[in-house]
């Protein structure tokens, strides 16, 4: 409408360990996806200006601060959920939510929280494919194959070994680089599609 190039930043779409899940799902390398888990847990943010983060009208609290990232990735990687079951406990000592999203042939359980105690922030996932379990915990990605092999994808991996290459990169820098290249080339940044974001916001508003 205004003839400008814009992109809403959703950094997990550029995060190597998360991109890996989409690649494995699309390629079928380890068979069909059977189930998944994504979590994003931490404590109440005390660092924001003017207590901005604790003002629901401005920040949206846990659904929009934390859960939005995992939900956006799910919609990006697997499409719009067929159904969902959501629970939220918004109390003085916690803002905690959990949701199960159903997709054709599998479901993903998610959780996100702000706790009143000084619980350290952490993001994690587990995705169970037919032939392997892929995890991301404490900043490390591991693949547990059904044949007993366990390994961490690394930037040193090469195609001729059959292992998976994870580029060592800064997801935020890759996101900015992608948008910059779209602006310079005159291409619309369709890696972050408006219809996917509308789906995400619609689901978040149900909490």
Set out the residue ranges of the language-model regions:
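Predominantly a Rossmann-like dinucleotide-binding segment in NAD(P)-dependent oxidoreductases
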Residues: 4-5, 12-87
């Amino acid at each position: 409408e205004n003839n400008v190039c814009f992109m809403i930043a959703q950094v997990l779409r550029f995060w190597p360990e998360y991109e890996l899940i989409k690649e494995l799902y699309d390629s079928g390398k380890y068979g069909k996806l059977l189930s998944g888990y994504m979590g994003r847990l931490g404590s109440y943010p005390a660092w924001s200006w003017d207590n901005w983060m604790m003002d629901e009208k401005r920040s949206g609290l846990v659904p929009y601060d934390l859960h939005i990232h995992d939900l956006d990735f799910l919609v990006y990687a697997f499409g719009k959920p067929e159904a969902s079951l959501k629970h939220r406990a918004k109390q003085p000592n916690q803002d905690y939510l959990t949701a199960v999203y159903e997709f054709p042939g599998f479901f993903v359980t998610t959780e996100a929280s702000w706790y009143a105690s000084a619980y350290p922030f952490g993001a994690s996932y587990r995705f169970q494919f037919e032939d392997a379990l892929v995890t991301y915990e404490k900043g490390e990605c591991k693949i547990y194959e059904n044949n007993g092999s366990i390994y961490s994808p690394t930037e040193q991996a090469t195609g001729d070994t059959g292992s998976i290459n994870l580029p060592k990169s800064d997801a935020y820098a890759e996101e900015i680089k992608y948008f910059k290249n779209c602006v310079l080339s005159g291409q619309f940044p369709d890696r972050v599609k408006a219809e996917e974001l509308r789906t995400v916001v619609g689901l978040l508003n149900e909490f």
